[in-house]
Structure formats: structure tokens, C-alpha cells
Amino acid sequence: LRDVAAIERRLGAVEALTKNTVAREELILSLSGISDMERLIGRIAYGTAGGRDFASLRNSIERITEVKAQLTAFTTGRLHELDNELDTLTDVAQSIRDTLIDEPPFSVREGGFIRKGYNAEVDRLHEILSGGKGLLADIETREKEKTGIRTLKIGYNKVFGYYIEVSNSFKDLVPDTYIRKQTLVNGERYITEELKNLEQEILTAGDRDKALEFEIFTALRESVTAESVRIQRAAGLIAELDTLCSLASVAVNNNYCRPSVDDSGVIEIHDGRHPVVERVLKDALFVPNDTYMGEREDRAAIITGPNMAGKSTYMRQVALITLMAQIGSFVPAKSARIGVVDRIFTRIGASDDLAGGQSTFMVEMTEVSEILHQATPRSLLILDEIGRGTSTFDGMSIARAVLEFCADPKRLGAKTLFATHYHELTELEGILPGVKNYSISIKKRGDELIFLRKIVPGGADRSYGIEVAKLAGLPNEVVKRANVILKELEQGGAYQAKPREETEQVSLDAIGEAEVLAAIRRAQPDTMSPIEAMQLLYELKQKLS
């Protein structure tokens, strides 16, 4: 967000949730039972939803009533607005509950998911599919009463299906509508039109039930889809509330503070911490750091210090705290004042783009180019070791030019955190207005290097690269040799690589021979005239000479 009023409104909601623990925990519990309604209504509208998707939507909607009841604890601010704006969608949930069973199957092609009592014909087909025992019992009772045959009973066999069996003692009471099918020792078996129709219904009930249930399901899908705008709006409000509860929970659990947000262009952080690094540290406490960046003074910070000292972590934490403040979140600091930025640009780390044919340095320069073209004076720039992918002088020149461009208010003048190992750049503090030197403090005890992780004013005097290499486990022989070479270089560049002219000449000869061989491979002697062959020989001889 870049509108201060919108940020403050969100911060106010987060603060209200941090202060009301009971309501916050109840809301989190209710929200945990709500599925992604936006995705569900999307599947329903596209016709790809199954029965379980409808059940998930129904269960989610029914939780909204709980959420609204819990929001009544907040009588002002954005949370009160959410209570007023949130649609309970009870009619949609009731429609799904009336139509479908509690736990419908995912596939709706096999039937068996319409709730009993919703449709009389579906209920009848379900009765038939269960063996028609109830229907057969009704027919048997009715026929006994109509004919007066007390021993009448209905049975089934595979030869002619359902039948009515009458004992010989009641044969005279058999009505003319009965059709005799089988004679037994003790009685007769008959069929009726009603039994034949019932048998036919039983044979076709499965297909008819599937078709009818799918027809009802399609109608339900269309009716729910018609309410998709309401459902999507409710889903958006639920997502906003879920975000606010999450931000409040994180703020309480990690001792975050509410930042002050304005349009001053000032970033002032007291005891800021990296929100991720402080959580993953197991055996040590995170060392907090202060930050001050203004629109005129301390606009650009040059940060020097050894590798592993914490330069990148510090710059990242400033960017993250700024970003967190502008999404309406509390921040990991004792206090923070954030002047709204329009964009945050970072150039940290790089690797080869093998598929694109770009080297590490080319990738780095491409990213820097995009930053310089897109950044504005209201942007925050995080630039880590620009120019390290090429030679020392080239890299230093590029780094200085980039820093001058970023810091100069006549060109860009954006707030910039610039980490570098080029200590020569620290002289810009006295040349460019708004540039300030900082370094990560360390302590050296004998050969041991202790990182204090604290950022302090002033540039570092050296990079301690060899000490860091030793910490990384380089062999002692290599470390000792590196120290010798470093001393020679520091004494005026006495250590120099000797030119290797012979190697260069061999390289040139090899290039000439390669060109000759390539020309011979391309030649087609069968199609060449004597003059053309002679001309080719002269050309090859000239290449070799």
C-alpha cells in the first residue's frame, strides 16, 4: 500500500486484534474451518466441481455466521466495517444442505447424493434400488385385504421374476386379474401387471436415478453459480480478515511494534530485527540495529565490512521492515517510522543464466540497469556488492558511478543501502551530500575474528577476507601463502604476475592452424578448377605465415 490512510486503517485493525486475545483466538479457530471459497465457486461456475466441493462450500459458509458473531466485539475501525459488509450467505448454504447429503461423494455421476425428502421421485427410486422391500410389502398387504387371501405372499425367482403365491385352499378367491405362471403341489403362482411394472422399474431404476440426481445437481450448480458475485465478495472479506488475524498473531508472538507511517520520506528504525533470521537462530540472540535515512541527510548509506559480518542481513531487514509496514503489519523493532516508498528494488546475489547465455556479471548489470531506469526519488534501493563480477578497477568504477547516480538528487536521489568491499568508495561521504559511511563492527582476538553484528558509523579499514577464508576451512598452507601475497600487495604491488609471451604466441599459432584446417574441410576438390585450387593454396599459405 502507498496510501497512508489505508495503511493506518489496516494497522488499526491489527492493533485491535492484538489487544483482544479472546476474540482473536476465536476468530482464528472459526477461520480455520473455512476453505478457499473463491476457488470453490470458480470450480462450480466452470462445471468441474464435485459433491465434496459443494459440501466444503456449505461448511465454509456456515462458519461465516460464527465469524460475524465474533466480530461484534469490535465496534469501530475496519473490523467493525467487515462485520457490516460480510454477507452470511445463509440462503446459499441452506439450498446446498436441503439438496445434498452431509457427505456427498466427489463424483456425481453414480447417484446416491440427494438428501432424502428433497425429491419424491428420487426417494421412490432409492426405495426400489434397495430391493423394493417396502413397496413389495405394501402390495402384499393391499392384495391380502382386497382378496381376503390370508396366506398370500410375494416372492421372486430368476425364471419369471416377482410372483404372488396362493395356497390351494384359497384358489377360489384368486381374482381374474391374476395371471397364472406356475402350478405347485400346494398352490399356484401368479403375476400381475403391477408386479411386472415394478420389476421393470427395479431393472431400470439405477439409470433413471443417476439421470434424475444429476439433473437436480445441475440445477443446484446453476443456482449457486448465480450467487457467485456474493460468494466471491464474502471470500475476499474473509481473506482480508484472515490476513489481519495472522498479522496480529505474528506481532504478538514475536514482540513486534506498530510502526508510524507517513509521507515524510524518512525511514527511522530503532532496534530493528530481521523477521526470518531471528526465528531460525537457535544458539544465539539476534543483534538488533538502528537505521536512519532521510530525504536529504543520510539518504545513501555505504556499508563496508567483512563477509559474513551481516551486511546483507542488515540491508534485507530494512527492506522487509519497510515492506511489512506498508502492508499494514507490525514490524520487528522497538519503534519504527516509515516514510512511504513507491517501490523497493534489490540487487542481491547473482548466478549464471546458462540457458540465456549470460554470465554472472551480465545478469548483475542487467538487473542494475533495470533498477536505474525504473527507480524514482521515492524508491528504496538495496544494492549488494555491485561490480564484484569483473576486474577490480572495472568493478570499482561501475560501483562508484552507480552510487553517484543513485545518491545525487539531481539525477535520482533515491534512498540507497549500498554494501561494498571497495573501501575507496567511502571517500564519497565527504564529496556527495547525503552519503554516509557505516560498517559492521568486529573484534579481533589474536587470530580469531569475532563478528559483533552491530552497524556503526564510519567505514571499515579492511575486508578480513583471509580470516573469513580460514573460518571456511581453507588449508593452512593456502591461508599462509595468501597472507604473504597480501603483504606484498600492500607494500606497493611488488607481487606481479609475469607476462607469458610464448604462451600467447602459441595460442596465436593454434588459431591460425585451426583456420587452415577449417578451410581445408570446407573445400570441395572434385568441383574445383585448377585455378581455384591454386588460389586456395595461396590463401592457406598466407594464413600460416
For each predicted feature, which ranges?
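Alpha-helical coupling/stalk and coiled-coil linker elements that connect catalytic or binding modules
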Residues: 1-309, 313-345, 367
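ATPase nucleotide-binding head domains, primarily ABC-like/P-loop NTPase cores
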Residues: 1, 167-199, 244-511, 517, ...
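Short, amphipathic C-terminal "tail helix"
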Residues: 50-53, 525-545
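Hydrophobic residues in alpha-helical segments
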Residues: 18, 44-45, 325, 372-375, ...
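Dynamic helix-loop-helix/coil hinge segments at AAA+ ATPase domain boundaries and subdomain interfaces
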Residues: 226, 522-525
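Amphipathic alpha-helical segments within well-ordered protein domains
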Residues: 15, 41-42, 221, 387, ...
